[in-house]
Amino acid sequence: MDGSHYDILGIAVDAEPLEVRQAYRQRLLEAHPDKQGGVDKGAVTRIQQAYRVLSDPTQRSAYDGELAVQIAATGVHGRADALDEHSLDDFEYNEQQGVFTMACPRCSSAEGFELPEQALEENATARPGGGMQVIVQCAACSLWLKVDFDIVYTSE
């Protein structure tokens, strides 16, 4: 349950106050010790903090501004709608650096899209049909893409 307050509550950034409250209650029920077989105080604390911020218009506006700055700085985000989708298989992988790269389909910058493995781990969200997804911006232009991938575990 990592990510933004929106990710924690499982809501869209434009969610109405009623949706925020309903998601908060649902997440608390899901995190309840009787449902989880134990107490994860960290999860409950994150849910409560997300609700406190997103249910207060002033705090939410300030948080949205901070989130926008963070997204602009990293060029990677976990959620968005109406973007072109690509598979991580479309990217080239540099094993030494642990980075996936792809030329931008709009501006043709050779490594316009760069996804370090850590960015995938920290920013990915689950896709409704299974697998994971991350949103990334071209380093040379304003194009954003959804990048879909599956987590594959290998035994070493």
Curated annotation (Swiss-Prot):
Cellular component GO terms, alphabetical: cytoplasm; nucleus
Entries under SMART domains matching the protein: DnaJ
Residue stretches making up the J domain: 4-67
Keywords, in A-Z order: Cytoplasm, Iron, Metal-binding, Nucleus, Zinc
Domain DPH-type MB: 82-150
GO terms for MF: ferrous iron binding
GO BP annotations, alphabetical order: protein histidyl modification to diphthamide
Domain notes: The DPH-type metal-binding (MB) domain can bind either zinc or iron ions.
Disulfide bonds: none
Compartment(s) of residence: Cytoplasm; Nucleus
Function: Required for the first step of diphthamide biosynthesis, the transfer of 3-amino-3-carboxypropyl from S-adenosyl-L-methionine to a histidine residue. Diphthamide is a post-translational modification of histidine which occurs in elongation factor 2.
Protein name: Diphthamide biosynthesis protein 4
Protein's pathway: Protein modification; peptidyl-diphthamide biosynthesis
Lineage: Eukaryota, Fungi, Dikarya, Ascomycota, Saccharomycotina
Coiled coil segments of this chain: none
Residues reported to bind Zn(2+): 104, 107, 138, 141
PROSITE patterns: DNAJ_2, DPH_MB
